[in-house]
């Protein structure tokens, strides 16, 4: 209704993105009722936060199904349309929980890091058809974030900071990545209130070699010590983004 009130056209679909057939129906509905499809924003998500040794199979499956499988399902359905028209843009939602890390979110982190890999693969596979794919790692208060359990004062303070960051701050970046004039593809952007970050992607940072090869002993005696200065600490997202939102 809000879209229509501002002069746009909108249709609603209440099916689950975790269902491959339902995702295809969503794409078909968009094409039939709106006259085409140019942009896909994979935004569906749920949380089932729990410390790893207490995580159930259902905790794992439900989060992976909505986030990672859901992103695949909708993207795969749209890929056929994009390929035929030789244009289109995907914007996927990843998270610093996967890119950096967080407590009690093994399911969510795995799904979100998987989405970053999915987006890069789509960018590589579909670039020949003038189709682009990027990720946004959003910092924003939403209904999903509102389900995070508050266990102590530190978590409560973090949640209060999150409440100051609205989804309206994310939308301009999603739109900018989707317009025809944009040539950006295969990238990951963090959006935190009025800040935009280009997030790094995995590349080698140090290397060692040994002409005669390695044994477990020489790995421990030589390889590990020579690379140890470059090890990443067990940071959480809030350790890296430790300042108040700007």
Language-model features and meaning:
Residues 6-9, 29-42, 48, 87, ...:
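A glycine-rich helix->loop->beta "capping" turn
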Residues 14-25, 57:
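The beta1-alpha1 cofactor-binding region of Rossmann-like NAD(H)/NADP(H)-dependent oxidoreductases
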Residues 51-52, 59-64:
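Substrate-binding pocket helix/loop in short-chain dehydrogenase/reductase
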Residues 75, 111, 119:
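Active-site helix of classical SDR
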Residues 81-84, 100, 116, 121-131, ...:
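Active-site-adjacent segment of SDR/Rossmann-fold oxidoreductases
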Residues 95:
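Residue(s) in the substrate-gating loop at a strand-loop-helix junction
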Residues 156-246:
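C-terminal helical subdomain
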